[in-house]
Swiss-Prot record:
Cited Gene3D superfamilies: 3.40.50.360, 3.90.1010.20, FAD/NAD(P)-binding domain, Succinate dehydrogenase/fumarate reductase flavoprotein, catalytic domain
Protein name according to UniProt: Urocanate reductase
NCBIfam families: flavo_cyto_c
Organism the protein comes from: Streptococcus parasanguinis (strain ATCC 15912 / DSM 6778 / CIP 104372 / LMG 14537)
Role according to the record: Catalyzes the two-electron reduction of urocanate to dihydrourocanate (also named imidazole propionate or deamino-histidine). Dihydrourocanate is present at higher concentrations in subjects with type 2 diabetes, and directly impairs glucose tolerance and insulin signaling at the level of insulin receptor substrate (IRS) through activation of p38 gamma (MAPK12)-p62-mTORC1. Therefore, the UrdA enzyme from the gut bacteria S.parasanguinis strain ATCC 15912 may contribute to the pathogenesis of type 2 diabetes by producing the microbial metabolite dihydrourocanate.
Cofactor, free-text remark: Binds 1 FAD per subunit.
Note: S.parasanguinis strain ATCC 15912 is significantly more abundant in subjects with type 2 diabetes (T2D) compared with subjects with normal glucose tolerance (NGT).
Cofactor: FAD; FMN
UniProt KW Membrane keyword: no
Length: 803
């Protein structure tokens, strides 16, 4: 019999560990007992899903394969330790390996009564819905005065105690045999037909049609139009496929899309119930065979790319265009990374196009203030460009009626926008050669994407939050998905390969040259990819709060519970991989917050996200508090200084400029109470708890500034629309971690450099995993330009130098 024994504490010295080790030896002829430690289990946080991390999956797999479970708990403040509680939370959040699993509770404590109260509480927890373990009644083993209970060999001293433990354990063996009979597969019968159900997805309702025959689920059709394109797409293919393949509801949620995953599973369960069957029967069946694949695999490629976001797919496309074979290895079930979550357009100066648009009020003032900067504050390598820009701007200001732009303006704004001081007063700015490549080749990247198949809107030029200038190229399709869908199609149709569910654990090095990767598959199997070169494109570490806190030198505090707009996949893996072969790091102390994030989830796709020229930010008192056209870090700090929570106020015309939304989504959010709407500004103020007169006065003043083209309060850099056409809207916002500027040190060819400034042979990096470009603050819209410019360069250089 196979049993798993869990040490219910992360303490280095524990009598509960000693008890389980004794049981492992003492009952070795009766059962194979595997002891699992909870030392590395993260504290439970439902906004930071760790279900698919190796430590949680180790418990999931071991418990699923075991005949029974033993949990040994100490007693802390009359209950179980928080670390044990966190483990159980993780094992009942998106996975449920304890459901129906025969479980024995034991415990050891200094107290004479052992861990009796903790064991009672643990029993209640294990009986709870979602956990639903089958706990052995009675016969609980409580080891009191544990500090006197063991001899020098770790054996229990008292024979009567051993005898009682024997009786409890032998009863548990019988209990396991009987209880597991309840878990044997049952036959199921449906009333044939197609059943329509509506369940909850991440963004709202998910209508579904489930077709069943007499004994099978035959088809699952989901209307996913309400979900964000690209983010949850894998849910709508994988989960129905595994349900049908295994005729089971024992299907794991997809990492990064747990809400939608559980929505699909709940919807099918409802349909099963409508068809006259018990969904619990399907929940207790084993997983689909494809979900249990453990076969090791080995691949050969010319270039292997770590990360399936924009930078990784751009690198793969460049490798294919050079006539070579790439393999992309992606950590998560779905590709796209942070790119698919991008909420804004892509920066690139295109003066011929931009010049066909009229200038906005305030833009000429922005340029005048820029060229008035004291030259003594400009770093030497940028001074020649700054002086040349002054000449360009002075010529433009003779007729400032149209929208101006140039490569020099883009370069200087990227430089100044990233120039920051840390908490100790140390200054950082973007590496000149990297900034030059970005700004010179940005439009080339737009044209390259167009050639591959991305369509851009030509009827408007826009600007994401904190971009400082209108030079945004907005795709026709939803923002990030527009890039990922086209690049994925290009890579697959031209002979590239993409491996998902495969976090890379190690770089393979041969005689000092990086020659491939070792990854771990969905079920722990080894995946080897041998290649002539490796490109790291795995993103930053915005979803790794501990790593943010470790390196932070810019923000006064990064709270433990801070939200992020990032995919949960970006936890710094590529940076650690680079360090493992000697890579140097740069700018790690600087991270960026997105000021206009959802206050609960950190996401960017809720509410009305409009161009900054139409931002009207008010604090909880109904007053403006910042130049809304400013950089992201300044907007975020201003929001934090005003309590964190603020509101974006909009009217019906401003609503029409919003990204990534529809009237249907807006109506659903108003109904859900996450977006506010009213026929008057005063009524809107009442809904969000403000003084109606204060908010009305704020909007009246703002409208007068738009008319005048000048903001005497905060000197807003650009205006577009007034707020005066009903209905009016308020979108609650709060800063969340959005981007990490630091990373692996690279050169303009994307070689990864070691601490001596030397090239690490065979290793390249592009995108957020690399540092040195954005310095202390990234301009909005520059991340997309970064990943597609340097992603292409990485693929091209890797082929040129190694293949």
């Amino acid at each position: 019999m196979k049993l798993v024994a869990i040490v219910g504490t992360n303490a280095k010295q524990s009598y509960n560990r000693s008890l389980l080790q004794f049981m492992q030896r003492h009952f070795a002829t009766k059962a194979d007992i595997e002891i699992l430690e909870i030392t590395d289990v993260p504290m439970f946080n439902e906004t930071d899903d760790q279900t698919d991390t190796p430590v949680i999956q180790k418990f999931n797999q071991a418990i699923s394969e075991a005949d029974g479970v033993i949990i040994s708990t100490p007693e802390h403040n009359h209950t179980i330790p928080s670390s044990l509680n966190s483990l159980i939370e993780w094992l009942s959040f998106n996975i449920h390996p304890l459901d129906g699993k025969p479980t024995m509770i034991v415990g050891a404590s200094y107290d004479v009564q052992g861990s009796s109260r903790a064991q009672l509480h643990l029993r209640q927890i294990l009986d709870a819905p979602g956990v639903n373990a089958t706990v052995m009644p009675g016969s609980e083993f409580l080891l009191g005065r544990a500090h006197r209970a063991f001899d020098e060999n770790g054996d229990l001293i008292d024979e009567r105690t051993v005898d009682f433990l024997d009786s409890c354990f032998y009863r548990f063996l019988r209990f396991v045999s009987v209880a597991n009979q309840l878990n044997l597969p049952e036959e199921i019968r449906f009333e044939p037909g197609t059943y329509h159900v509506t369940t909850e997805g991440h963004n709202g309702k998910l209508p579904m049609d489930v077709t069943v025959s007499e004994d099978r689920i035959e088809k699952i059709e989901i209307d996913s139009s309400g979900e964000s394109s690209g983010i949850a797409d894998v849910v709508f293919t994988r989960i129905p496929a595994e349900i049908i393949e295994g005729q089971t509801l024992n299907v794991d949620a997809v990492s990064g899309a747990s809400v939608t995953s559980n929505g699909v599973l709940d919807g099918v369960a409802r349909a099963v119930k409508q068809a006259g069957a018990n969904p619990d029967v399907l929940r207790k069946r084993s997983k689909a065979p494809s979900a249990l694949d453990k076969e090791d695999k080995t691949y050969q490629a010319d270039v292997v790319i770590v990360g399936g976001g924009g930078a990784g797919l751009a690198a793969a496309a460049a490798v294919l265009q050079a006539g070579k074979k790439p393999i992309v290895v992606e950590k998560f079930p779905a590709i796209g990374g942070n790119t698919v979550r991008a909420g804004g357009p892509m920066n690139a100066p295109d003066p011929a196009w931009q010049g066909t648009f009229e200038a906005h009020p305030g833009e000429a003032n922005t340029l005048q203030e820029l060229i008035a900067i004291d030259e003594s504050t400009i770093d030497p390598e940028y001074l020649e460009d700054f002086r040349a820009l002054k000449v360009e701007v002075e010529q433009y200001l003779q007729d400032p009626s149209y929208l101006f732009d140039s490569t020099l303006l883009y370069r200087i704004q990227t430089y100044i926008g990233g120039k920051r001081k840390d908490l100790q007063g140390h200054e950082i700015h973007g590496q000149y050669d990297l900034v030059s490549v970005l700004t010179e080749r940005a439009l080339e990247s737009v044209r390259w994407l167009e050639d591959i198949g991305v369509e851009f809107v030509r009827s408007e030029v826009t600007m994401p939050v904190g971009a400082l200038w209108r030079r945004g190229h907005k795709p026709v399709q939803p923002m990030g998905y527009a890039f990922i869908s086209v690049l994925q199609k290009y890579v697959l149709e031209n002979g590239g390969k993409i491996l998902t569910d495969s976090p890379v654990k190690e770089l393979l090095v041969e005689e000092g040259t990086v020659k491939g990767v070792r990854a771990e598959g969905r079920n722990g199997q080894t995946i080897l990819v041998h290649a002539d070169a490796v490109v790291l494109a795995s993103g930053g570490f915005g979803a790794n709060t501990k790593m943010l806190q470790k390196y932070n030198t810019y923000w006064t505090e990064i709270a433990d519970d801070i939200a992020t707009s990032n995919t949960p996949a970006v936890t710094g893996d590529g940076i650690l991989l680079g360090q493992s072969v000697g890579a140097d790091l740069v700018g790690m102390g600087f991270s960026q917050m997105m000021p206009v994030s959802d206050p609960v989830t950190g996401a960017l796709f809720s509410g009305l996200q409009v161009p900054p020229a139409n931002f009207i930010m008010v604090n909880t008192e109904g007053k403006r508090f910042v130049d809304e056209y400013g950089s992201r870090d300044k907007l975020s700090q201003a929001a934090i200084d005003n309590g964190g929570l603020f509101y974006l106020i909009a009217d019906d015309r401003i609503k029409a400029t919003a990204y990534n939304t529809s009237q249907e989504k807006i109506d659903a959010q108003v109904k859900a109470g996450t977006l506010y709407r009213a026929d008057t500004i005063e009524e809107l103020a009442v809904q969000i708890g403000m003084d109606p007169q204060v908010l009305a006065d704020t909007i009246k003043k703002y409208n007068s500034y738009v008319d005048a083209g000048f903001d005497p309060e905060f000197n807003k850099g650009s205006f577009d629309l007034k707020c005066e056409v009903a209905p009016f809207y308020a979108t609650p916002r709060k800063p969340a971690v959005h981007h990490t500027m630091g990373g692996l040190k690279i050169d303009t060819s994307t070689h990864v450099l070691n601490e001596k400034g030397q090239i690490i042979p065979g290793l390249y990096a592009a995108g957020e995993v690399a540092g040195g470009l954005h310095a202390g603050n990234r301009l909005g819209g520059n991340s997309l330009t970064d990943i597609f410019t340097f992603g292409r360069i990485a693929g091209q250089t890797a082929v040129k130098e190694n293949c």
